[in-house]
A protein has these predicted regions:
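Short glycine/proline- and aromatic-enriched beta-strand/turn motifs that initiate or cap beta-hairpins
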Residues: 24-71, 145, 224-233
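Gram-negative (and chloroplast) outer-membrane scaffold detector with strong preference
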Residues: 25-27, 70-153, 220-233
Length: 233
């Protein structure tokens, strides 16, 4: 009988030794928590800009910028960005025939500052290194550098010249961040900006617009694709 009890205890002990490693194993999670809550980034891209029906506004551009981000907790972050659009525009003289109004092409560089709420779709975690997101917000844009040389040479009246001015901008975007390491990450983003183009007051003179076809203003979009790198801290 003691021999039987000893044999039973030995079997139970052996089973326990076999099961212990298996019970200690854990299935690795595809999600990794992101510890750092602040981020500084630089980005470059290309922008497809709508110049408007009268083709007065800025056109396609090379785009550069910088961004500061801070996490607010959970899935929400704030992005504060400054973006430079290195663009061109068609310089038009409304006093000339409609098929001969364009007298030249000039540079126009725009600066855009905006603040956006970012919704991280995986929260404060990344999935296999990826963290997809959506953003929305607003800001303002204004010209940083404008080439008016052709207008001066053509002696265009000031009321006939297009001026971008300071414009409110609406912004939305979507993309994903790929975390290369705990602090370094890459980000690809498709962005849509919305702003208003205003027609110069001189264009509404009777001799320039006898049929009253010109609109006073028009909302246009800038569609951009951005690639950037950021450092988290």
């Amino acid at each position: 009988m003691p021999h039987t009890k000893f044999l039973a205890l030995s079997i139970l002990f052996s089973i326990g030794m076999v099961r212990s490693p298996a019970s200690a194993q854990t299935i690795p999670s595809p999600y990794t928590y992101i510890e750092n809550h602040q981020e500084l980034a630089f980005f470059v891209g290309k922008s497809n800009i709508d110049a408007g029906k009268l083709e007065l506004g800025p056109r396609d551009s090379d785009t550069f910028g910088a961004r500061y981000s801070v996490g607010l907790g959970g899935a929400i972050s704030i992005d504060i960005s400054g973006t430079l659009f290195k663009s061109t525009r068609l310089i038009q003289d409304v006093r000339r025939p409609i098929d001969d109004r364009t007298i030249n092409r000039g540079n126009i560089d725009l600066l855009l500052f905006d603040a956006r709420i970012r919704l991280n779709l995986t929260g404060r975690r990344m999935w296999h290194g990826f963290q997809p997101f959506l953003t929305f917000g607003g800001g303002f844009a204004f010209p940083y550098l404008v080439d008016n040389g052709a207008e001066e040479v053509a002696f265009m009246r000031s009321e006939d010249r297009y001026v971008f001015g300071v414009r409110f901008t609406g912004t939305t975007s979507g993309g994903t961040t790929f975390h290369v390491s705990r602090k370094l990450s890459l980000r690809v983003e498709g962005m849509l900006n919305l702003w208003q183009i205003k027609t110069p007051i001189g264009w509404f003179a009777l001799e320039n617009d006898p049929l009253r076809l010109f609109s006073e203003s028009e909302w246009v979009t800038a569609q951009s694709i951005m690639l950037g790198a950021s450092w988290r801290f």
